[in-house]
Amino acid sequence: MGKFGDFSSICRMAPIPLCASVGPITSIATGVGIEPDCYARNIEVANTIIFQGAASVMHIVALVMTVVMLLHVRGKFTAVGRKEITTFFYLYMILTFLSLCIDAGVIPPHSGSYPYFVAVQAGLASALVTCLVINGFVGFQLYEDGTPLSLWMLRLCSFVAFVISFLVGLATFKSWAGLGPTNTVGIFVVLYFLNALQLLLYVVMQIILVTRTLQDRWPLGDIAFGLFFFIAGQVILYAFSSPICEGISHYLDGLFFATTCNLLAVMMVYKYWDSITKEDLEFSVGTRMNNWEVKELLPQGPEEDRRATVYADPIYEGHYASGPGTGSGASASGYEGGHHRRESHGYTPSPNRQSLRY
């Protein structure tokens, strides 16, 4: 077990992108970088080698599912926190697309631009978690949702989190400000420690919200499942990635399971938000048919009396009819209840890493 903030043991177990830009410079390697003990085998498509084929497929699935969730969220015009939760899904979509490019090898690990993209990925991860926490405050109605105050506070807090993680990550990869590939305490703190605290804060806030303001307790199940999927993905990635990879002959590794579990956790966030919000159908007639309530039948003229019908007119006179989806029970939208300053551009993967066999 290494010291606090050391990525040596982590990177040998888990094939995470930043491992290509941290670690000591040895006499054998041409640059920094820690290669995992086992990683998923590459695939070849149109004379192009693609890293992490299974994980890349899951990234594409995650993009499709995010689009579906966004369409559902945008369809609930009057739901509480609609614009705020939409920002969360947009950030997740951008992070997933960038992770797809990095994991699949579209951005080569030995290129000069690779550390910058990994730093952006770290910044987006922190911004995503911060955005989720700010969304957690919306339910307490401390301020009006959807207003410039709410939206700009969400954007500014997420942007600050992005800038902090991006700068700390870039300083670590480029040996700036006392940080470096062998001094990774800073990026460890902002990526793991602070983000874990924010996620814990979000879970506690939502439990308080459900138990104290809502009569329905089913949303607690969404929180529990989301927490389970996220923790399971992290445990598989950082504790069992190499054994799984070796056990199934390099076809999959922990990154595939972590990507899948992260998607399921995000889907539980959507399910939780959907279960504690409802919309006012009176203001959603643009996407739903027959939402009008008929107060009274129109008076019949002489020419209408000549129409042949098997129903007697007096039966319908003076009665009220209502279209589906409306009624007096509809309520307003709301909640239901080294010392060497050597510039490095990442390591050059070993010949086995470029092979299609492993």
Curated annotation (Swiss-Prot):
Disulfide cysteine pairs (residue numbers): none
Main location: endoplasmic reticulum
UniProt key word Transport: yes
Subcellular location(s) per record: Endoplasmic reticulum membrane
Top-level taxon in the UniProt lineage: Eukaryota
Membrane topology note: Multi-pass membrane protein
GO biological process: cell wall organization; chitin biosynthetic process; protein folding; protein transport
Protein keywords: Cell wall biogenesis/degradation, Endoplasmic reticulum, Membrane, Protein transport, Transmembrane, Transmembrane helix, Transport
GO molecular function, one term: unfolded protein binding
Region (Disordered): 321-358
Keyword Transmembrane helix: yes
Chain ranges passing through the membrane: 49-69, 88-108, 117-137, 159-179, 185-205, 220-240, 250-270
Compositional bias of kind Polar residues: 347-358
GO cellular component: endoplasmic reticulum membrane
Assembly notes: Interacts with chs-3.
Summary of the function given for this chain in its UniProt record: Chaperone required for the export of the chitin synthase chs-3 from the endoplasmic reticulum.
Family membership: Belongs to the CHS7 family.
Stated name of the protein: Chitin synthase export chaperone
Species name: Neurospora crassa (strain ATCC 24698 / 74-OR23-1A / CBS 708.71 / DSM 1257 / FGSC 987)
